[in-house]
Amino acid sequence: MKSVIGRKIGMTSVFTEDGTTYPVTVVEVLPNVVLQKKTVEKDGYEALQVGYEDKKESRANKCELGIAKKANTTPKYFVKELEGDEIYSNHEVGSTIDCSIFEAGDAIDVVAKSKGHGYTGVIKRYHAHIGPKGHGSGYHRQIGSLATNGRCNNRVHAGKKMGGQWRPQTTTIHNLVVVDVNPNNNCLLIRGSVPGPKYSVMKIRSAIKSLKKKIPVSKLVNYKTETVEQIEKIQEEALEAKAKEEALKAEEKESKAN
């Protein structure tokens, strides 16, 4: 099993050569630095503890500084554990894991925190029935009777479904597909949506259910895979061409005036 930590950037659409449109989520996967290696002898299980996104040393405590020093890296904002025999055997403390471990067509699972909804009523939170909508009814989107039958039931039982905070929850979406891998820009394109708001951190791992085979994905036709340097060069060439065009127009105006 392969796994890596990434950050959700947003959603867009890409097209393939046969005209198919894919709604995709762009996930930034910066290099995951291995901070610790959990062993069966010492910890009782095997896993890699990785860090994502650098943190200033002034914002880290002594424990974080010590772990980062052993791995010869800087402290990290997000520290998570990754499981899997493949990444465990191929990486040591101080090494990095990036998006190149995946390929286009790989089936993956995404583990992330869903969006919170704040304070919500019982209709939205638990899908309770809506009351009568006539003008004479006493309620519309409120909960009905709280009473129960039986002895000593003149109270509201613990766990009664009512309105309240609908907080974020850790959610797993199974069997998504990697549409494209771009190691130059440290990003993955994942078909469909993933849980959580923009810029939230998530774990991407190989699919654990029956869909483990690689899915054929057609070649993309409108997706730019240039590096940052190549993009800057293209922009400079465009600016130079525009400047030449403006200079020619100015010369034509001067010649007409003369």
Please identify what each model-predicted range represents:
Residues 1-258:
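Extended basic (Lys/Arg/His-rich) segments that typically form rRNA-contacting surfaces
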